[in-house]
Structures are given as structure tokens and as C-alpha cells.
């Protein structure tokens, strides 16, 4: 593999960082509630593991904050100094179902996807049923992430809306201090 960045790689990193940073803000400012165009409401929350990054080259700094019941103060402080989220653990909830997934900003790589537990009714079940349900749950999770990303792009690509969103994000950061 080449060390030369592919065309658009730097844009992807910035867009990914802006997305995860916006997602953290929106998940707290909107109590984690999102809605699909079909009207399905779901919750999306940043879990207790966030990594923020800022700077370039040799002055690149990364801070990772994790811990049960952590308020993520150090990561929020990093945001207020210009860092952006570069990795986050997300929790998605719909009704009684819960998914968790780790997302990297640089390439939207998803790791450690955990789906809701699949209930086994009995030994007479179709052997493919559990597999197909697992695939359905994975696709559902990815669909929710795609929807939130679509909402982000709608705001991000409208300059006036993005400026308003930046103001709201700064107010959110100031309120958290």
C-alpha cells in the first residue's frame, strides 16, 4: 500500500470528524432523539468512550476519555480548544432493542457492532432464522447511522444552517463548562 493519501482522503477525515462532533452535540442537545423520514423514532447516544484529536503532523494531539458514568469533561474541553471527535462508541436504541458500535472518523470504519440479543424459541426453528434476523439487525443499525449522516449532510451543506449549528454547538460547549 502507498503512503500517499487517496484523492479526497483529507476531506473524508475532516467530514468524519465534523460528523462525530456534530453527532455528540446533537445527541446531547436533542436528548438523543432522531427520526427517520418514515417517522420511526430512535435514540442515538455517545457512550462512555470518545477520542478527540487536533493539530497536524508532529503537533497532532489525541485524548481518549472513557469510564463508566464519565461525563467526558476532558473530551469536551478538547472540543473547546479546537479538537474534533475522531472515534466514538455509539449506542442506538429503538423500543427495547439496543445496538452499540464504535465508529472512526477518518474512514467511517465500524468496529465491535453488538446487536440486540436474538431470542431462540425452540429447537424446531428454521436454522437460517437466527442468521437472517442477525443480518436484519445489522442492516437496521446501519440504516440508522446512514439516516443520521444524511441529516448531518443536510445541515452541513447549507452554509446558513451550518453557521447556526456552529453557534448552537459553541453554546452547548460553553454550557458544559
Predicted feature locations:
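Intrinsically disordered, low-complexity, charge-rich terminal extensions
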Residues: 1-177
Amino acid at each position: 500500500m502507498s503512503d500517499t493519501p487517496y484523492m479526497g482522503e483529507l476531506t473524508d477525515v475532516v467530514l468524519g470528524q465534523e460528523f462525530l462532533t456534530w453527532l455528540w452535540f446533537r445527541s446531547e442537545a436533542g436528548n438523543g432523539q432522531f427520526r427517520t423520514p418514515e417517522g420511526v423514532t430512535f435514540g442515538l447516544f455517545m457512550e462512555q468512550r470518545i477520542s478527540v484529536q487536533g493539530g497536524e503532523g508532529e503537533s497532532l494531539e489525541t485524548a481518549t476519555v472513557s469510564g463508566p458514568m464519565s461525563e467526558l469533561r476532558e473530551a469536551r474541553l478538547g472540543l473547546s480548544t479546537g479538537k474534533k471527535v475522531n472515534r466514538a462508541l455509539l449506542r442506538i436504541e429503538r423500543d427495547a432493542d439496543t445496538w452499540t458500535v464504535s465508529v472512526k472518523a477518518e474512514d467511517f470504519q465500524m468496529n465491535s457492532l453488538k446487536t440486540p440479543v436474538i431470542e431462540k424459541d425452540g429447537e424446531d426453528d428454521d436454522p437460517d432464522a437466527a442468521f437472517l434476523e442477525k443480518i436484519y439487525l445489522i442492516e437496521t443499525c446501519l440504516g440508522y447511522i446512514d439516516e443520521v449522516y444524511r441529516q448531518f449532510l443536510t445541515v452541513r451543506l447549507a452554509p446558513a444552517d451550518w453557521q447556526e449549528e456552529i453557534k448552537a454547538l459553541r453554546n452547548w460547549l460553553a454550557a458544559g463548562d
